[in-house]
């Protein structure tokens, strides 16, 4: 799939070396199709790494996507140059009058804080409320999923005894579900978090479908029946070495972290870590774009407001 992004974005050259088709504005303007508009709220500290990870997985269908990156203006990134943010990212005020077919909300390293103590919480709350009428399908990842469930349904997050870090098995629970088309009965994916949600709260407080779960990770992916809300607590987008970098970062900072489970051969951190989730990741993101976004989104974006009323969002 051609993804349409600023040709100066650092991720472009990485993606081109991987034979991923990236299209600039000039070429895209000559294609007589309505591209899908995707907004990515990138809350991860290593912005450029996350950009590349997500764009790589969004490039798996023949559809043309227009990608915009969003950041919280009430938070200043300490790990990404301000020039990068000013060049390639938009603020909520800059996009609030636009309509998007899909949105991805990433994880964030703030799960140790109560939601209300996150410095950009009020701006995040306003953005999520806005998304009900301006975005058709929203994919929430990790902390983004916990925050979305808390704001929409009052589902709490709970501190775990120790960090969940590793590659874990999960079972698919709804045979033939569109998000899991092409999946086997079980799959593995990276998880990296200190907090979890309660399955009982999900069942009692929401009408969401639990689509996958595992013995170590608990609830893994859930979604509304119309696929306008999708919540994933793992990190299918992660690269082979992402968990390794997190482990070495924490070890070097003196935190004595556990070695990520099911990741390094024989738990030897000098070995190259396994990569055993890339096919599942490609399927999942492709299914989201094809079935939750492309098949369902209204051709005219402003129809989303009418759909929001019909689905009970307004």
Curated annotation (Swiss-Prot):
Entry GO MF terms: homoserine O-acetyltransferase activity; homoserine O-succinyltransferase activity
Family from the record: Belongs to the MetA family.
Full protein name: Homoserine O-acetyltransferase
A single Gene Ontology CC term: cytoplasm
GO biological process: L-methionine biosynthetic process from homoserine via O-succinyl-L-homoserine and cystathionine
Keyword Phosphoprotein included in the entry's annotation: no
Catalysed reactions, as listed in the record: L-homoserine + acetyl-CoA = O-acetyl-L-homoserine + CoA
Transferase is among the record's keywords: yes
InterPro entries membership: Class_I_gatase-like, HST_MetA, MetA_family
Provenance organism: Streptococcus pneumoniae serotype 19F (strain G54)
Site (Important for substrate specificity) residue list: 192
CDD domains documented for this protein: GATase1_HTS
Domain of life: Bacteria
One Pfam family it belongs to: HTS
Keywords, comma-separated and alphabetical: Acyltransferase, Amino-acid biosynthesis, Cytoplasm, Methionine biosynthesis, Transferase
Chain sites annotated for binding substrate: 163, 192, 249
